[in-house]
UniProtKB/Swiss-Prot annotation:
Keywords: Cell membrane, Cell projection, Cilium, Coiled coil, Glycoprotein, Membrane, Phosphoprotein, Signal, Transmembrane, Transmembrane helix. In the ventral prostate, expressed in glandular epithelial cells. Residues 637-674 form a coiled coil. GO terms for biological process: negative regulation of caveolin-mediated endocytosis; negative regulation of pinocytosis; positive regulation of cell projection organization. Glycans are attached at N270. This is Prominin-2. Binds to cholesterol. The chain crosses the membrane at residues 107-127, 154-174, 435-455, 473-493, 780-800. Glycosylated. PANTHER family: PROMININ PROM PROTEIN, PROMININ-2.
Length: 834
């Protein structure tokens, strides 16, 4: 039974292995190579993105909109393109009436300012003379019923006017200081902006070279991956082929075990058959002799009644099985002589070791390929190497730098003058704001003391110091108002004229695009101010188009008129470079000549088994004879019968004969029959195993030989298919590093290095500096100061009117007449000199 299991287990494993060893379609396993790592490229110096210049929010920002709306009412005329064109090209031919017509709103404001400048000081002078002669600004002549209402109304209007002056003065102070604080940084930002633009083209080659040098990053990463590519590819091949190779090797191992077990059984059958035949030849004569003697003895007259059972058994005492009828197996054994010559277990272990060492084998075979790949990898692609040298910017760089340098040099004196005059304006603004503050203080003190004096005075005709002091403070405020009215209106109009024209003529047209349209129209600018030429723009691109394209991130060579066109995509086309690497790697083939799966000795053993005819042996003939007893009768039972008969005999001679026959029969059974029975018992399992396994063994042997032969032809192609897929995966990953570099370079060049965004940013910064940081607070300053200046007039009127009520009222007779009653003087008698 144990021998049967020893053969059935290998056969079951062999059948399963043959089923699993059929070739399968192999899919690419790219995940085993790992993901593409993210390459970190060093930022190129000087390409750090600069945020656009923005103005910090200010609490009085809402005031800017009010000023702009006021200026839009003052200046209703559109942008004077023809007037500016004439002014720039031929200043002497500019007609005054055209200027006046365009500046009509400002002329009206100038007339108003002139009237203010003329009338207010003259009025102040007249009022001063009148006060000196005590004819103006005196007292209330009479007390009447509506006096309290008039006084309250005047004080209310004066207080409101003073509050308006106070608000305007605070806003004027704030805008004056804010304008001064913004002017310095704004003026300093102009040369900084021009200086940054000078390097817009000249610094590009140096930055491009820095970008080209970083091609070493993907080179280093790919070189690092190449160090382990052989082992990685070998692991992929091993993982893909093990589902094919391992079952075949397991089948070979199982078939070797089955072959060994079958030969052992066959040898046992052959040896046992020979012994059985020889033993039966020696057993037949003594059995026949015993039978004849027993029949003669038991058929005598004395044994008619008592010997029927023994006689029946003695009659059956003859050979049962005829072992000479069993077919010979020595011919099959002769064909299997020396089998198994190969050590299948050792062979399978060696093949397993060879297959498991596949990663090392591939690595060793790829050493020369990796060396060649690294040598080719160390070289830079032609396009990347010439990335900086091919940039055609020499002429444009010179023209651009000269234009910006000239503009910077010409602008410095004007910028210094702007700072100097701004300082003067700031000082004068502080002085005049202080004067307005003085007027406000005088008004507030006058109102406070005057009201206090009114409550403290019992009789309106009585003089009271607090009321008198209040009236004097109000008159002092009036004096200061007349005194500072002229410088106030002059400063307001001067700043209004400058700031208003900057806003309406420059900023408004800049925002609407009319300024760009004027600059781009041929003939509007003199030849020396041809911006398209000075900036080196392409002939078909205007300044406004350049601004819009640069704001969108267009590259320099698409906007500037460079020496030659610059094709970035052509320089970043590294397909030729990567194609050489791909071709070198894809041409690699793995040689698996050491992996045989079945060595020649094992193949000969299996072929010998296949042609041995093991399955053709008539095992049924063996079973027919094995199932028969060696002797038909039970010799032990017959011996007992004879011994019983011997005990029943009275005659000693017969008793002795029967006992002797029984003893000899037992002896024959033990010496001849029992060994034959043992041989039959030994032969039975071997025959049954061979009967059931020999056909399967032959089929599996044929299948295994066919599969091994087919795999020997298909395995190289399957291996190369796996290698090709794995190589594609490896190349895809490595090309990903070069793609990262190309993407980074394209983004770096187009968005940071060779982008003309600094040009549009400079224009936006210029608008921010001129209009938002300087013009807006400047205009807010004169607006607030003008507010205060014109509120001085109602302040003067209400202060003069109110001051009368703070002085004592003159007495008059009880009369309803409005005229003052003259006191009657009684004439005195005087002595006359004669």
């Amino acid at each position: 039974m144990t021998r049967t299991l020893d053969l059935m287990v290998p056969l079951l494993g062999l059948s399963l292995g043959l089923a699993l060893s059929l070739p399968r379609a192999v899919a690419a396993d790219c995940g085993s190579l790992g993901r593409v790592e993210h390459l970190a490229f060093a930022p190129v110096p000087g390409t750090e993105p600069t945020a656009p210049r923005v103005r910090a929010p200010w609490p009085l920002d809402s005031l800017y909109g009010t000023v702009r709306r006021f200026l839009s009412v003052v200046q209703l005329n559109p942008f004077p393109a023809e007037l500016i064109k004439t002014l720039l090209n031929d200043p002497s031919s500019v007609k005054t009436d055209e200027v006046v017509r365009y500046e009509a709103g400002y002329v009206v404001c100038a007339v108003i300012a002139g009237l203010y400048l003329l009338l207010v000081p003259i009025t102040g002078l007249c009022f001063c003379c009148c006060r000196c002669r005590r004819r103006c600004g005196g007292r209330v002549k009479t007390e009447h019923k509506a006096m309290a209402c008039e006084r309250g109304t005047l004080m209310t209007f004066l207080l409101l006017t003073t509050l308006m002056l106070l608000i305007g003065m605070v806003c004027a102070f704030a805008t004056n200081q804010f304008t001064h604080s913004q002017t310095g940084p704004s003026v300093e930002a102009v040369p900084e902006t021009l200086l940054s633009l000078r390097g817009l083209v000249s610094d590009v080659p140096k930055k491009l070279q820095a970008v080209a040098d970083q091609f070493s990053s993907p080179q280093k990463q790919v070189s690092k991956d190449l160090d382990g590519v052989g082992e990685n590819l070998g692991n992929i091949i091993h993982n893909q082929l093990k589902s094919t190779v391992y079952p075949v090797l397991a089948s070979v191992h199982g078939l070797g075990q089955a072959l060994q077990v079958s030969i052992d059984h066959l040898q046992s059958v052959n040896a046992t058959s020979v012994e059985l035949r020889e033993g039966q030849q020696h057993l037949g004569p003594p059995v026949q002799a015993h039978r004849e003697r027993l029949l003669a003895l038991l058929q005598e007259s004395w044994c008619h009644e008592n010997c029927k059972g023994a006689l029946s058994q003695a009659s059956a005492l003859q050979l049962g099985a005829d072992f000479s009828q069993m077919p010979p197996v020595d011919d099959v054994l002769h064909r299997l002589q020396g089998v198994p010559e190969a050590n299948f277990s050792s062979m399978v272990q060696e093949e397993n070791a060879t297959f498991n060492n596949l990663p090392i084998l591939v690595h060793m075979q790829m050493v020369s390929v990796v060396k060649d790949l690294k040598k080719a990898l160390a070289e830079q692609p032609e396009g990347v190497r010439m990335l900086a040298q091919a940039f055609p910017g020499s002429e444009a760089t010179s023209r651009w730098s000269q234009a910006l340098e000239g503009l910077e040099q010409r602008s410095r004196p004007y910028l210094q003058d702007v700072q100097r005059y701004e300082t003067y304006r700031w000082i004068l603004g502080c002085v005049l704001c202080s004067a307005i503050l003085l007027v406000v203080i005088c008004n507030l003190l006058g109102l406070s003391l005057g009201i206090w004096g009114l409550f403290a005075r019992e009789d309106p005709s009585h003089s009271e110091t607090k009321g008198e002091a209040g009236a004097r403070f109000l008159m002092a405020g009036v004096a200061f108002s007349f005194l500072f009215a002229a410088p106030l209106i002059l400063l307001v109009f001067a700043t209004f004229l400058v700031g208003g024209n900057v806003q309406t003529l420059v900023c408004r047209s800049w925002e609407s695009g009319e300024l760009y349209e004027f600059v781009d129209t041929p003939g509007n600018l003199p030849p020396s101010m041809n911006l398209s030429y000075l900036l080196g723009l392409r002939k078909n691109i205007s300044v406004f188009q350049a601004y819009r394209q640069c704001k969108a991130g267009t590259a320099l060579w698409k906007v500037l008129q460079l020496n030659d066109s610059y094709d970035l995509d052509k320089h970043l086309d590294i397909k030729q470079y990567t194609h050489e690497l791909q071709q070198e790697l894809q041409s690699f083939k793995v040689d698996l000549k050491d992996l045989d799966l079945l060595n020649p000795a094992a193949r000969q053993n299996l072929e010998a088994l296949q042609s041995s005819g093991l399955e053709k042996i008539h095992y049924r003939d063996f079973l027919v004879q094995i199932q028969k007893p060696v002797v038909k009768t039970d010799m032990g039972q017959l011996a007992k019968e004879l011994e019983g008969l011997a005990q029943a005999q009275n005659e000693s001679l017969r008793r002795q004969q029967l006992q002797e026959e029984a003893r000899e029969l037992r002896s024959l059974y033990q010496e001849k029959v029992v060994p034959q029975e043992n041989l039959v018992a030994k032969l039975n399992p071997s025959i049954r195993v061979l009967e059931s396994s020999a056909p399967k063994l032959q089929v599996n042997t044929s299948d295994l030989l066919d599969i091994v032969a087919r795999l020997k032809g298909e395995l190289p192609a399957q291996l190369n298919h796996i290698l090709r897929n794995a190589t594609e995966c490896f190349l895809t990953r490595e090309m990903g590093y070069f793609s990262q570099y190309v993407t980074w370079v394209r983004e770096e060049v187009t968005q940071h290095i060779a982008t003309c965004q600094p040009f549009s940013k400079a224009l936006d910064d210029g608008h921010m500096i001129l209009c938002d940081m300087m013009a807006n607070p400047w205009n807010a300053f004169w607006f607030c100061l003008g507010w205060c200046t014109f509120f001085l007039i109602p302040s003067i009127i209400f202060a003069v009117k109110t001051s009368k009520y703070f002085r004592p009222i003159r007495k008059r007779l009880s009369s309803t007449s409005s005229e003052e009653t003259q006191l009657f003087h009684i004439p005195r008698v005087t002595s006359l000199k004669l």
